[in-house]
Structures are given as C-alpha cells and as structure tokens.
Amino acid sequence: MAKEQKMQSSPQALKAGHLPAVKAGGMRVSKKQGNEENSAPEKNAKKTLQEKPSSVLNMTKMQAMNILAGELEKLSHDFPGEAAQIAHQKPRPTVEKTILPKRLYIIQQPRRC
C-alpha cells in the first residue's frame, strides 16, 4: 500500500500539485494525502506538567487574592456602604399608578353542532 502511494505521489501522477480525485459511487471524491509534515497535531497530546507546576499556580493565585483583598478593604473605608445603597435605590413615585384591568375581547363564533 505504501509503495502504491509513493507511485501515485510522483510528479507524473500529481495534477495541480495534488493527487487526482477518485470516483466513488459516480461522484468525484478528493483523496487526502498522508503527509506527516502537513498533518494536524494529535488531539490527544497532553501538555507536560513540568512547565508550570500546580504549586506555583496556587501561589500566584493566592498572591493575587491578597492584593485584591487589600484594595477592597481600602475602598470600603473610603466609600461607606450606606451611600452606595442610597445611590442605587430607585426613586419612589409620589402618585401611584392605577393599573386598569385588561379589556376582554369576546369573539362571536358559531356553535358546534
């Protein structure tokens, strides 16, 4: 089988730089080449854990959390929570709107016999 592909991949068998189409069931189907150079990387390839150990990742996450906690504490002293609540409350209307009941549409239809 490998010899057959090598024979077909010779410059004489190539058309427009690729293998000619194959007929299957009366329709032309393109035939994919089995080049290792142009093939996609393996889907099951796993990253090595040696690049970034989990302990280093945990330390960087903890440092980021400590920095954020310190900043949030400073902001809470500068801006009290009551002021934030008042700023976000909706103004209450002085006059309540009365909601009218929806109008019923009665459609006259003939009775079923």
UniProtKB/Swiss-Prot annotation:
Signal peptide: none
InterPro entries according to UniProt: DAP1/DAPL1
Keyword Signal: no
Top-level taxon of the source organism: Eukaryota
GO biological process per UniProt: apoptotic signaling pathway; cellular response to amino acid starvation; negative regulation of autophagy; ribosome hibernation
Gene Ontology molecular-function annotations: death domain binding; ribosome binding; translation initiation factor binding; translation repressor activity
Disulfide bond entries: none
Cross-referenced Pfam families: DAP
Disordered as annotated region, ranges: 1-57
Key words of the record: Translation regulation
Function summary: Ribosome-binding protein that promotes ribosome hibernation, a process during which ribosomes are stabilized in an inactive state and preserved from proteasomal degradation. Acts via its association with eiF5a (eif5a and eif5a2) at the polypeptide exit tunnel of the ribosome, preventing mRNA translation. Plays a key role in ribosome hibernation in the mature egg by preventing mRNA translation, leading to ribosome inactivation. Ribosomes, which are produced in large quantities during oogenesis, are stored and translationally repressed in the egg and early embryo.
Quaternary data: Associates with ribosomes; preventing translation. Interacts with eiF5a (eif5a and eif5a2); preventing translation.
Entry's family note: Belongs to the DAP-DAPL1 family.
Protein name: Death-associated protein-like 1.L
Gene behind this protein: dapl1.L
